[in-house]
């Protein structure tokens, strides 16, 4: 079996698998490979246990500006449309209601203004008063005594929307479809990349077991591991990484759909939200928390997996200065300490209960169950030159046949949009064609018309 490929994608999560499919379906590349360190695809950040299983289109994510929401909506549409085109309803993609709520006068005023800006972007977006929310999500309004909560509450969202996705199943489908189209493509599992070497006009991707695959172009979609690989080759040396791990709590099946809350604009992390679990029936997930930790990948044991690559990246005065500046802000500092407490046995659950009761006021301590093995690390990029935290996705384009992607949330939602950008770059670099018009026709006709 030949180990030479036009392109090799490092990382078998949903972003890498989406590009594997996009190159196979729409480009003229002959052979593409994925190398993945786990024994199965999508076992880390794209696992159903690692994320909230949400298609983040911007309609209920209150930290998105209208400008960002317009872009994210188009990205989300591609992912949603792919699943519907392939007939993956109730297997990969699920239809539920969803809403964002404001609790208290200040948040209600914010939500009313937000609705006026966002109803033009999202066709069919509905505004919900307290009575309508009670009709749709009774447990958001009813207190433990069966009496309506006293706070003013408004919201907006959809009574029915394809809003939930199992990104691990989606990853598997991308690869299945790609292999049907291009049987000469390859997927290498249990292939943990040790290093990447430039050899004349190709790259050698070398595993810890001394296996080698060769490519004219390498795309690194390796989540938290992308930046260490880039720095090992001399790229991205001006960047650091702040790994933020999210945890969840299970509660009984008390929500009919997704319920999001207003996010503090100072905080780069999602506000607590409630999501009926698409995989574990009868459970609702509340979270995530946000805990910084010295690891590129979460493990059950606190001391297991502390990352030497991360320490090498971050043990410098610029990163310490960024961290000091962040912690100098009282709100951010309190948020960090509060989330550290959430992880503690016994006391953590008591502290988290108050946050969870913002969504379901009748919750009791007995209702909360820490979701062991759920949640994963999201790499937040630190720009050492600008001395600040960079929000969202980060790309290192070398223009030398290798690109590195770091894709925290909503990277899974945007997987096909990111795959489009990467596939066009790869095809152009290799002198191959890419059928952009057909891509838009299949997955985003709105952009074709515009």
Swiss-Prot record:
Instruction: Report the GO terms under cellular component.
Output: cytoplasm
EC supergroup of this enzyme: oxidoreductase
Gene3D superfamilies from the xrefs?
D-Amino Acid Oxidase, subunit A, domain 2, FAD/NAD(P)-binding domain
GO process terms (BP): tricarboxylic acid cycle
Q: Which cofactor does it need?
A: FAD
Q: Which residues cross the membrane?
A: none
| EC number per UniProt | 1.1.5.4
Q: In which pathway does it act?
A: Carbohydrate metabolism; tricarboxylic acid cycle; oxaloacetate from (S)-malate (quinone route): step 1/1
Keywords assigned by UniProt? Answer: FAD, Flavoprotein, Oxidoreductase, Tricarboxylic acid cycle
Q: Which stretch is the leader sequence?
A: none
Top-rank lineage group of the source organism: Bacteria
Q: What catalytic activity is recorded? A: (S)-malate + a quinone = a quinol + oxaloacetate
The GO molecular function terms of this record are: 2-hydroxyglutarate dehydrogenase activity; L-malate dehydrogenase (quinone) activity
Q: Does the keyword S-adenosyl-L-methionine apply?
A: no
- Do you know which InterPro entries this protein is assigned to? FAD/NAD-bd_sf, MQO
Asked if Nucleotide-binding is a keyword of the record, the answer is no
Sequence similarity: Belongs to the MQO family.
Q: HAMAP family annotated for this entry?
A: MQO
User: Could you tell me what this protein is called?
Assistant: Probable malate:quinone oxidoreductase
- Tell me the lineage of the source organism: Bacteria, Pseudomonadati, Campylobacterota, Epsilonproteobacteria, Campylobacterales
